[in-house]
C-alpha cells in the first residue's frame, strides 16, 4: 500500500481498523503460548493498539513500528503516557515511555540495528494490511530483520475477496504456510466467526469473516 494512503486515513480519522479493546485472541493465547517468559515483543504496524499496553502490563518490553506520527502521538496521549522522542535518521523517530518504544517510520525501511534483539512477534494488523502482492515482501522483511525467527502470534482474516476490496485483506491459511512455512512450524490455535463484531465490514458487503490465530515457532535445526 502507498504510505500516503495510510497517512490520509489517520488524518481523516478513518481508523475503523483500530480496536477499542484488547484483542481477545491475544488475551487467550499469549499466556498459553509464551508461558512465564517475558521476552521483548515486536509489534509491526502497531497503530495505537491497546494490545501494547496489555503486553507491557504483563511485564514485556514492547517495540512497535508505525508509519503515522498521528497514531504514535495519539497512542501515548490516550494512554496517559509521556513520551521522549529521538530522531534516529533514515526517516525514523523513536518515541519512548518506560517499557514501550515506538519507531515511527516505514516498516520496509527498518533495519536490524533499529530493531535490536527481539524475543517474540505479535502481528494483529500488519499482514492483513498488505494486499496479496505485498504479503511476500512483508514476510521477507520479517526474516531480514529477525533472522533468529522468534516465535510469533499471528492473527489473520479470511473472507471472499470478491465481496470486498481491502484493507483489511484476506490471508488464507495456505498463504500463511507459503509465507512462513519454510522457517516456522505453524499451529492453528483458533478460527472464529468475526462478522458480528465488525459491522463496518458487513456494511461493505461481506457475508462471511473468519478471524484466525496462529502460533509460529522456529523450525527445529536439522
Curated annotation (Swiss-Prot):
It catalyses: S-adenosyl-L-methionine + a thiopurine = S-adenosyl-L-homocysteine + a thiopurine S-methylether. Keywords: Cytoplasm, Methyltransferase, S-adenosyl-L-methionine, Transferase. S-adenosyl-L-methionine binds at residues 10, 45, 66, 124. It is found in: Cytoplasm. Its EC number is 2.1.1.67. HAMAP family: Thiopur_methtran. The keyword Cell membrane does not apply. GO terms for biological process: methylation; response to metal ion. GO terms for cellular component: cytoplasm. Belongs to the class I-like SAM-binding methyltransferase superfamily. TPMT family. It comes from Methylococcus capsulatus (strain ATCC 33009 / NCIMB 11132 / Bath). Pfam families: TPMT. InterPro entries: SAM-dependent_MTases_sf, Thiopur_S-MeTfrase_Se/Te_detox, Thiopurine_S-MeTrfase, TPMT. Its main location: cytoplasm. The keyword Heme does not apply. SUPFAM superfamilies: S-adenosyl-L-methionine-dependent methyltransferases. GO terms for molecular function: thiopurine S-methyltransferase activity. The lineage of its organism: Bacteria, Pseudomonadati, Pseudomonadota, Gammaproteobacteria, Methylococcales. This is Thiopurine S-methyltransferase.
